[in-house]
Amino acid sequence: MIQQESRLRVADNTGAKEILTIRVLGGSGRRYAGIGDVIVATVKDAIPGGNVKKGDVVKAVVVRTKKQRRRPDGSYIRFDENAAVILKNDGDPRGTRIFGPVGRELRDKKFMKIVSLAPEVL
């Protein structure tokens, strides 16, 4: 469950290391984001020479959450960290590599490019 002011690790090679959530997209009163939901965030920590700089406002999709999520078959999935992938305006990932596993929910929400770049889909 990601909400305003939540900090997430960035799971791609855009140069950002950590982002802070500004807003959860998808409705005026929406409070929480889970795997596959899009957020607006600001870059809090970045490496020099990367595509994004500290202070940039970006859109990102959540790919891992610590809070468990119940799947339709009754199983639960949870990860060791909260992580996101930075997006371009057309919804494609800005980076060219994805680090770590991603949730299968991304396939249902039509983030096929992220699913194909990810080393593992759980």
From Swiss-Prot:
Entry's Gene Ontology molecular function annotations: large ribosomal subunit rRNA binding; structural constituent of ribosome
InterPro entries: Ribosomal_uL14, Ribosomal_uL14_bac-type, Ribosomal_uL14_CS, Ribosomal_uL14_sf
GO cellular component: cytosolic large ribosomal subunit
Alphabetical keyword list: Ribonucleoprotein, Ribosomal protein, RNA-binding, rRNA-binding
A biological process term (GO) from this entry: translation
A Pfam family per the record: Ribosomal_L14
UniProt KW RNA-binding keyword: yes
Subunit structure comment from the entry: Part of the 50S ribosomal subunit. Forms a cluster with proteins L3 and L19. In the 70S ribosome, L14 and L19 interact and together make contacts with the 16S rRNA in bridges B5 and B8.
Family according to the record: Belongs to the universal ribosomal protein uL14 family.
NCBIfam families: rplN_bact
Known function: Binds to 23S rRNA. Forms part of two intersubunit bridges in the 70S ribosome.
PANTHER family: 50S/60S RIBOSOMAL PROTEIN L14/L23, LARGE RIBOSOMAL SUBUNIT PROTEIN UL14M
Protein name per Swiss-Prot or TrEMBL: Large ribosomal subunit protein uL14
The organism of origin for this protein: Kocuria rhizophila (strain ATCC 9341 / DSM 348 / NBRC 103217 / DC2201)
Gene name as annotated: rplN
